[in-house]
């Protein structure tokens, strides 16, 4: 059970970091970078949904 919790915690941190980078990329008009990050964003979001994490407050981008 502890391993599952560690994986979820890591995924949450990754999700937050990815969103920060996406926001920065969008501000800098780095759309190619934004699209690559968006792929990671979608994958991590799907993983967190499967893990049952409520993303309503964590998801800033909401795409």
Can you say where each PLM-predicted feature lies in the sequence?
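Short, charge-rich amphipathic interface segments used for partner binding and complex assembly
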Residues: 7-10, 17-63
